[in-house]
Amino acid sequence: LDLDADNLRLRVQGVEWPYHAKAYVMLHKPAGTECSQKPSTYPSIYTLLPTPLRQRPCKSAIQGVQAVGRLDQDTTGLLLLSDDGHFIHRMSSPKKHVPKVYRVTTKHLVDDQQIAKLLAGVVLDDDPKPVRAAACIAIDSQCLDLTLTEGKYHQVKRMLAAVGNRVEALHRSRIGTLELPPDLEPGHWKWLSAEDLLRLSPVP
């Protein structure tokens, strides 16, 4: 029996559901949500996903799609989820140097000296090796686009604190060359297309 998987449609609880051998989705994470299956204070991002995504069969002990990395509860923006372990590892490993762009709103004015320090590298309290921004572009006097290729705990907030400023709002707008679509509302999700996945490939 031959099946055309590309055009296969399933019905889950009466709702038509396209077949995907592996799930790759993006979520516009809203503020006040946790990237955890067992949240401690705020609602879980997984409650924003439909049951078929949360309960997809998986070889690991945990069912369903998993977040590729994490965003703090107050951070908004582009979040990837998948049930492909190799994809999750490739996208979250610091060795792969996948660029991630954050729109940062600061409490104090951003000056050229602060930008220079972020680009040159700052030392965080848990690592003597300086961490630096791959790019830092001032949008206005209290807003900048910061590009990182690694993901330490609270990294953006700690980097801004290290140069004498403070993060007031944080939004991830891009991973690789994949941008968060302007029409994807907070709390909504969509399947990644083949073109989207190519935009997540490492930059040569």
Regions found by a protein language model. Give the residues of each.
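Basic, flexible Lys/Arg- and Gly-enriched helix-loop patches that mediate nucleic-acid binding at interfaces
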Residues: L1-P204
